[in-house]
Amino acid sequence: MISLMAKIRQEHQSIAEKVAELSLETREFLSVTTAKRQEQAEKQAQELQAFYKDLQETSQQFLSETAQARIAQAEKQAQELLAFHKELQETSQQFLSATAQARIAQAEKQAQELLAFYQEVRETSQQFLSATAQARIAQAEKQAQELLAFHKELQETSQQFLSATADARTAQAKEQKESLLKFRQDLFVSIFG
């Protein structure tokens, strides 16, 4: 009887160790994946902010007051986006929560607004933007599209990871339940014959 109790404790300890190991591996995976993606997003946001500053400094002589206001608005949005990425990086362990999902949606919306702004500037500024400014607008539009694609990929990957993790844990729990049930049956047979 003592041997059976020891076996039960050993199996419970083994299950607890496996759960702890799975939890550690999951946290490590999330940490590495999130760090790389947030580093890429932060770099893109910094490049956008640098572009706005450069465009504002070199375009004072031919940008209208309306275009100046739009540049200021876009620069403010880029700064907000950079601040969001820094905040998301600092709280990466919680990025799969509902709050992080909402922030990802907010960042995607801001990226779409930036893309719409670039398209509007390109359409309304053909008569006074130089060839250099046109090239910079195209570069910024490409960066905004890449940033939008990154956010969509991050959201899809997060959902796929959550689904795969949930399936794996469900299968593992089912297997452990069946193993425990068989052990109890064997225990019953060994005690009562």
From Swiss-Prot:
Q: Which Pfam families match?
A: Gas_vesicle_C
* Effect annotated for changing residue 3 to P: In strain: CCAP 1401/1
Q: What induces this protein's gene, according to its Swiss-Prot or TrEMBL record?
A: Gas vesicles are abundant in low light, and collapse after exposure to high light.
Among its keywords, does the record have Repeat? yes
GO (cellular component) term, any one = gas vesicle
Its subcellular locations are:
Gas vesicle
- What are the UniProt keywords, alphabetically? Gas vesicle, Repeat
**sequence repeat positions in this chain?**
19-51, 52-84, 85-117, 118-150, 151-183
Used how in biotechnology? Answer: Can be used as an oxygen carrier in mammalian cell culture; addition of 1.8% GVs in the medium enhanced the maximum glucose utilization rate by about 30%. The GVs have both GvpA and GvpC.
Q: Where is this region: 5 X 33 AA tandem repeats?
A: 19-183
Give the UniProt record's GO annotations in the biological process aspect. gas vesicle organization
Q: Does the keyword rRNA processing apply?
A: no
**Domain text:** The tandem repeats probably bind across adjacent GvpA ribs with each repeat contacting 5 GvpA subunits, stiffening the vesicle.
Database matches in NCBIfam families: gvpC_cyan_rpt
What else does the entry mention about this protein?
Protein sequence was derived from constitutive gas vesicle producer strain CCAP 1403/13f, DNA sequence from CCAP 1403/13d, a spontaneous mutant which does not produce gas vesicles.
Q: What functional role does this protein have?
A: Confers stability, involved in shaping gas vesicles (GV), hollow, gas-filled proteinaceous nanostructures. During planktonic growth they allow positioning of the organism at a favorable depth for light or nutrient acquisition. The ratio of GvpA:GvpC is estimated to be 25:1. GvpC strengthens the GV wall, probably by connecting several GvpA proteins in the same and/or adjacent ribs. Removal of GvpC by SDS reduces the critical collapse pressure (CCP) of stored gas vesicles from 0.23 Mpa to 0.08 MPa.
Q: Which family does it belong to?
A: Belongs to the gas vesicle GvpC family.
Protein known as: Gas vesicle protein C
Q: In which organism is this protein found?
A: Dolichospermum flosaquae (Anabaena flos-aquae)
